[in-house]
């Protein structure tokens, strides 16, 4: 078994590697130049970023080029950009590997940088880990299953490197604390802060920065020189003297070092920009890694066995927040990841952990003030970027101000970065959909067709659905207008399945592509059977269905939710001449959508009654050719969400439910009764979630699975803080 240092630094340099030492000033200049140039992309200046990075050939410049391509790839999901990102990141990984070995080989050179915290060459090991992590994410987004599987192995490689770096930080803090204690005992005084003990940190007897100690460790624990077989090396590696990661899928990573996360960028331990890069970069990468793995839905859980470790949402978020403190490229990307997570994922999920009071404690809830400060900081740093304006819009929407969210995205200014512009138009499309602004929504989604190739079938489908709603609104009052919208609705509905299946995720069709193709086939079959036009064969309002799938209800005010109920009421109105022909499936969809709106209105009694009616039916009614097989598992999740929102703790934070039933609205009389009441709600909530999690494969299971995974984690956290006596 090998320790951390043996793998990262004990390997002999390649035979053809240059033995020229890395001058610390040159290395620092390369790092600063590369990061400064790459950071320009966060201000929408992709040309400036590319030009600046083209001026250098260092490992940092190569990584910068890879990061720029990665950002563009993840913003737009376009295959050509993803290929470019993959190539650049591979080049960056190779370049960093050469420099890492050279730095280790020449660690005694007088002009090389010797970090008090990290072993020689750690900055290049981090470059490799960043390249591996980003390459893995691109691989997962790739349409090839082979590339997707390879991506999970890259994640494991990055994990091992990052965990090793964190162990260096942990050892540094432990030894500095021990040195401080020794000095305190000797002098009889206790320093007020570790920052004042910096003189001890460089002691040859206690500091891990000792060059002799590093060399001795490298010589004693030298790794095999032949490392061509990556899997063999990973399997043999041991980071802690316990079973290797690959052998124990449940192994817990290095415990989080809260001491170092309490240090801000102006701390004495971050005096050198190379150390700043390593600390911020390792926290960002490990934070992203832990966060992403924690979000994997049940349908992809088998892939976790490839990685060999579990995610940790709370720890990952704390590390991302730490990385965001730094005024560099890493800090900017970390801020973007944080804002995207809270304003996207958290607001998409309905069951999340309760907020924790105290400064910086609420990392798993929605720390609104902290997010607002972070966004303001990024807007100030990158005033020309539409990316941060987009995040401001998302934040407004997440806080039920959809009008403001839409207004921010309707300005005349355009981003020169095509991927950012595509995101802006897509977000504008969604906000218009939530606000029932059908014409703007349709036009915006059609604009998405030209800007992005990711899911054109969905764009056409929603555009057609908007015109269907306009057709229904005008059907009884303006026949000419109704005919116009009916024609456009049918046109876009027919275009949608022709472009479905063009894109793939891990070799599988995109969930909404499958959904759209099935819906169209279902409507066509009904039109033929009922002898009506395609638009008259459509069932429950597909726009309301889309609002539900994108969790638009959580962003809507009560007035906007009432408008959704009015739109849903059309199905049972006299204007709908085909409702009498509908079977239990379409009627269940109507009940489910109404229940979701009532839950958002905090009318849980009504919502649960509708859901109980659905769950009381034979589940086989919703299975079969062209059927909406997602109804029952989603109804289970909705029931769980209602129960979670009825808890006293939830009500204390978000306000009480609007109930008609005195029985349901009655509050427990005592604290003990309240806890017992809440425990019962959580127990029932968990039962419904477990049923949803174990449901057989169904349409959109990966999408719904994200909610289920987050919900199960929230329940587990509640149980851990409320143990049964």
Swiss-Prot record:
List localization entries. Answer: Cytoplasm; Nucleus
Write down any Gene Ontology CC term. nucleus
Q: Answer yes or no on keyword Nucleus.
A: yes
Q: Which InterPro entries match?
A: Iml2/TPR_39 (IPR019412)
Give the chief site where it resides: cytoplasm
Annotated region Disordered: where? 187-209
Described by its record, this protein's role is as follows: Inclusion body (IB) resident protein that interacts strongly with lipid droplet (LD) proteins. Involved in LD-mediated IB clearing after protein folding stress, probably by enabling access to the IBs of an LD-stored soluble sterol derivative that acts as a chaperone in inclusion clearing.
Family according to the record: Belongs to the IML2 family.
**What does the annotation say about its assembly with partners?**
Interacts with lipid droplet proteins.
Q: What is this protein called?
A: Inclusion body clearance protein iml2
């Amino acid at each position: 078994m090998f320790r951390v240092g043996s793998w990262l630094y004990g390997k002999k340099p390649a035979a053809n590697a240059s033995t020229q030492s890395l001058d610390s000033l040159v290395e620092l200049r390369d790092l600063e130049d590369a990061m400064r140039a790459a950071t320009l992309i966060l201000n929408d200046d992709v040309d400036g970023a590319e030009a600046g990075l083209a001026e250098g050939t260092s490992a940092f410049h190569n990584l910068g080029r890879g990061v720029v391509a990665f950002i563009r790839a993840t913003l737009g999901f376009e295959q050509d950009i993803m290929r470019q990102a993959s190539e650049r990141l591979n080049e960056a990984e190779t370049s960093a590997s050469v420099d890492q070995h050279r730095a280790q080989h020449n660690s005694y050179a007088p002009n090389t940088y010797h970090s008090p915290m990290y072993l020689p060459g750690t900055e290049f090991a981090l470059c490799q880990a960043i390249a591996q992590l980003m390459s893995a994410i691109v691989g997962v987004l790739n349409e090839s299953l082979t590339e997707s599987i390879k991506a999970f192995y890259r994640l494991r490689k990055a994990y091992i490197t990052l965990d090793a770096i964190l162990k260096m930080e942990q050892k540094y803090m432990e030894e500095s604390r021990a040195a401080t204690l020794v000095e305190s005992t000797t002098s009889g005084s206790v320093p007020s802060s570790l920052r004042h003990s910096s003189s001890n940190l460089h002691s040859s007897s206690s500091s891990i920065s000792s060059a002799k100690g590093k060399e001795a460790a490298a010589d004693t624990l030298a790794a095999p020189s032949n490392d061509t077989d990556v899997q063999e090396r990973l399997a043999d590696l041991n980071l802690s003297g316990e079973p290797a990661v690959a052998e124990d899928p449940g192994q817990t990573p290095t415990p989080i070092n809260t001491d170092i996360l309490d240090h801000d960028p102006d701390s004495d331990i971050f005096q050198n920009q190379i150390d700043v890069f390593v600390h911020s970069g390792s926290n960002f990468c490990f934070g992203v890694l832990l966060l992403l793995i924690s979000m994997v839905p049940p349908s992809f859980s088998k892939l976790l066995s490839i990685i060999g470790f579990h995610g940790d949402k709370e720890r990952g978020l704390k590390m991302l927040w730490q990385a965001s403190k730094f005024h560099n490229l890493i800090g900017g990307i970390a801020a973007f990841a944080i804002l995207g997570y809270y304003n996207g994922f958290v607001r998409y999920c309905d069951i999340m952990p309760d907020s924790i009071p105290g400064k910086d404690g609420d990392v798993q809830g929605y720390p609104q003030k902290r997010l607002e400060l972070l966004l303001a900081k990024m807007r100030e740093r990158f005033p020309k970027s539409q990316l941060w304006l987009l995040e401001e819009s998302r934040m407004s929407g997440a806080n039920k101000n959809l009008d403001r969210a839409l207004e921010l995205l309707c300005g005349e200014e355009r981003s020169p970065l095509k991927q950012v512009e595509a995101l802006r138009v897509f977000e504008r499309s969604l906000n218009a959909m939530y606000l029932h602004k059908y014409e703007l929504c349709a036009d915006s989604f059609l604009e998405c067709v030209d800007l992005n190739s990711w899911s054109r079938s969905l764009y056409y489908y929603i555009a057609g659905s908007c015109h269907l709603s306009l057709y229904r609104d005008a059907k009884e009052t303006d026949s000419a207008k109704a005919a116009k919208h009916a024609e456009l609705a049918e046109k876009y509905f027919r275009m949608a399945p022709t472009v479905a299946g063009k894109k793939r995720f891990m070799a599988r069709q995109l969930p909404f592509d499958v959904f759209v193709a099935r819906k169209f086939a279902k409507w066509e079959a009904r039109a033929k059977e009922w002898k009506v036009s395609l638009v008259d064969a459509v069932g429950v309002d597909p726009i309301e269905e889309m609002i539900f799938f994108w969790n638009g209800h959580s962003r809507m005010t009560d007035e906007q939710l009432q408008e959704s109920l009015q739109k849903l009421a059309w199905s049972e109105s006299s204007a709908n001449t085909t409702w009498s022909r509908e079977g239990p499936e379409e009627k269940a969809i109507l009940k489910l959508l109404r229940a979701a709106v009532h839950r958002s209105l905090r009318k849980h009694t009504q919502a649960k009654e509708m859901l109980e009616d659905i769950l009381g039916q034979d589940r086989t009614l919703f299975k079969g050719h062209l059927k909406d097989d997602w109804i029952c598992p989603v109804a289970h999740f909705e029931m769980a969400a209602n129960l979670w929102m009825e808890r006293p703790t939830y009500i204390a934070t978000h306000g009480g439910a609007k109930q008609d039933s005195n029985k349901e609205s009655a509050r427990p009389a005592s604290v003990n009764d309240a806890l017992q009441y809440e425990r019962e709600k959580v127990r029932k909530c968990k039962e419904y979630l477990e049923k949803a999690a174990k449901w057989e494969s169904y349409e959109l299971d990966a999408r719904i699975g994200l909610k289920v995974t987050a919900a199960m984690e929230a329940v587990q956290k509640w149980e851990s803080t409320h143990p049964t006596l």
